[in-house]
Swiss-Prot record:
Species per Swiss-Prot/TrEMBL record: Lottia gigantea
Domain of life: Eukaryota
Primary localization class, coarse: secreted
GO cellular component terms, semicolon-separated: extracellular region
Places the protein is found: Secreted
Region described as Disordered: 27-55, 83-105
Family matches, as SUPFAM superfamilies: PR-1-like (SSF55797)
Compositionally biased tracts (Polar residues): 27-44
Keyword set, alphabetical order: Glycoprotein, Secreted, Signal
Signal peptide: 1-19
InterPro entries: CAP_dom, CAP_sf, CRISP-related
Name of this protein: SCP domain-containing protein 2
Glycosylation sites: N21, N31, N130
Matching SMART domains: SCP
Length: 318
């Protein structure tokens, strides 16, 4: 805009200067007397305008030029004033400028995804630039925690608690889900190997290309097959016996699992805490159910409807 103002000012100043010097070029002094060395009767030279003559077509008068310059300067002031005003956006976020004065600007457009329960504290948030492919990929991993969605997690906990209930032990704890253990299991499951050297973990490798609802049923079937290797009162020695022993280990309270696709199979690993298969310890105490429920300091043990030990922390008194 400044370039156009300068260009028009220079362009319009040329005829204005010529009009001011007309008296000098026409051979007439400002007081009306003839200049020395000039012929008053001679015809004006080509390209020279007489002072008293009427402007020909295409020639601007001084008053017209002054009016145009005034209009141009007024337009320039209005444009500069409009550009200096802050632009209000929908978000209203402020960003400091180089002069230190906050100005309003529009931030990068973002898409916020939350899970179906819309609990950002648990699941966090994902900011995605407007790319449909990336959005679909992030949504799949966002809703599935460590390869397992909420229904599969619930099925794992419920079915393992059914196995623990059928044992009829005095001190059998009810298992609860732990996302912290699931994160640890996610590191092990990526190895895509069926060899399990961790006696506090259970694994399963099933022929299933996609992680679906049948994963839990097939895994439980494999784990129950290992019951034939279990011997109460004896330390587990093989992988099969140790896996079932860990499932019915009474002191274990929390579980976390993760699944990973490995070629045409699916591998799943579950970790328990407190860890089971401790040497020279019994997996559980036989007898009346819930007869010897234990709990952490400050919590109260209870017996639920499935005859499994539960515990809770009382609400603080204010």
């Amino acid at each position: 805009m400044n370039f156009r103002v300068v260009f028009l000012t220079v362009f319009l100043s040329v005829p204005f200067c010529c009009c001011q010097n007309v008296t000098e070029l026409s051979g007439t002094s400002p007081n009306g007397s003839s200049l020395s060395g000039t012929n008053q009767n001679s015809e004006p030279q080509k390209g020279v305008i007489n002072a008293g003559s009427t402007p020909s077509s295409g020639t601007l008068s001084i008053a017209s030029l002054q009016a145009m310059l005034a209009t141009l300067m007024m337009t320039n002031k209005q444009t500069v004033a409009a550009a200096s005003k802050p632009t209000v956006t929908n978000t209203g976020s402020k960003q400091p400028t180089a002069t230190g004065q906050p100005t309003l600007s529009q931030p990068r457009k973002q898409l916020i995804l939350t899970n179906r329960r819309r609990n950002p504290r648990r699941w966090g948030r994902v900011f995605i630039d407007n790319k449909s492919n990336l959005c679909a990929f992030e949504r799949q991993n966002f809703l599935n925690s460590f390869g397992l969605h909420d229904k599969l997690k619930k099925d794992i906990v419920e079915n393992l608690n059914k196995i623990r209930k059928d044992v009829k032990a005095q001190n059998m704890n009810c298992l609860l889900w732990s996302e912290k253990l699931a994160a640890k299991a996610a590191k092990l499951v990526k190895e895509c190997t069926y060899q399990n050297t961790n006696k506090a973990a259970i694994t399963s490798m099933v022929y299933e290309k996609e992680i679906g609802d049948q994963l839990v049923g097939r895994s439980l079937s494999r784990w129950m097959d290992n019951k034939k290797y279990f011997s109460y009162g004896n330390d587990c020695r093989d992988t099969g016996g140790c896996q079932f022993s860990q499932i019915v280990w009474a002191r274990s309270k929390i579980i976390g699992c993760a699944a990973e696709r490995c070629s045409d199979m699916t591998n799943m690993v579950c970790l328990f805490e407190p860890k089971g298969n401790v040497r020279n310890e019994l997996p559980y105490l036989t007898g009346n159910q819930c007869a010897q429920c234990s709990a952490s300091r400050g919590s109260t043990p209870t017996c639920n409807k499935d005859k499994l030990c539960e515990w809770y922390f009382p609400r603080p008194k204010f």
